[in-house]
Amino acid sequence: MKKVVIIGGGVLGSQIAFQSAYCGFDVTIWLRSEGSIQRTKEKLAMVKQEYIDAINLMNTEEGKSFNNWCRGIADTDDFNVDKCLETVEKAFISINLELNLEVAVKDADLIIESMAEDFDAKKDFYKMMAPLVGKNTIVVTNSSTLLPSKLAKFTGCPNRFLALHFANSIWKNNTAEVMVQPSTEEKYFNEVVEFAKQIRMIALPLKKEKSGYLLNSMLIPLLFSGLDLYVNGISDPESIDKAWTLGTGAPKGPFKILDTIGLQTAYNVVLMYVKVPSFLAPYNFKGMEKLLKKYIDEGKLGMSSGEGFYKYDK
């Protein structure tokens, strides 16, 4: 593989693009509008700074600890701070931003769809892109909750379509869940596993489809539980986070995680559950929808906007 195309320049899309470029791939991000270009440039600049900060930390004794070492950047036995910083600069200037979809996907070896969690939007996009996809191009979705089998028939290449799911802050949390759907041919699954390794991810294969993969099957119930405690007036975000971090030793509680993921993404996931009858729903999804919409309407989208449940330095 040589050319990798990322569909969408959001939080994870920008990270996937940067990590792929950092590892030497020719990377293009496809964006829908002129307005998206500036927003994506800003996200890429933020990701670049995250890499620089991580590399500088890795060059200290504190940074050499297991919890601080960024395995997506370098191994401990061949770490060279100057070389890593130079690679970051090269990656940053090498990423192409493109508005023309046909131009973006031309000669692509791998297309990684990283759009918001909206089934209809994804379906419409795949139907639009299908005639443009090369006969040898592999297409993957980074969807957090949607099964790839639900989208496969719209891609035009179901045998070359599967899921490749990344954790947030992929330079540090370097896992890549690779999941088949019934039409996926094994050789393309193996190629995606190999790509994940080439961009310094730990590939986690899923032999069957599972909504939420491995990580989100465990993570989403945590986030829902935290939100449920808040919207039902049980406690506040900071106290809920402390209960989790101090009680388990985890670095972040549910609300810090929500800010990292982005509240728009969280809102889109909650919308998938709002219509569940209240007597069947294990959580107060309507309360969560109202809460998250209020934050989004106020421009509080999480870390990317400088404020969500917490405030951040931009």
Label each region the model flagged.
Residues G13-I16, D120-K123, L146-P148:
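Short glycine/serine/threonine-rich phosphate/pyrophosphate-binding segments
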Residues E50-I138:
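Rossmann-like NAD(P)-binding element
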Residues I138-K208, N216:
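Rossmann-fold dinucleotide-binding core
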Residues N174-T175, L222-G226, G253, V269-Y273:
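A general alpha-helix detector
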Residues K2, C23-F25, T60-E61, K187-N190, ...:
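NAD(P)-dependent Rossmann-like dehydrogenase/reductase catalytic/cofactor-binding core
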Residues M1-I73, L132:
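NAD(P)+-binding Rossmann beta1-loop-alpha1 motif at the extreme N-terminus of oxidoreductases
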Residues T28, I202-A203, L215-S225:
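Structural/interface elements that position substrates and couple domains in central-metabolism enzymes
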Residues I7, A91, E98, S114, ...:
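Structural motif
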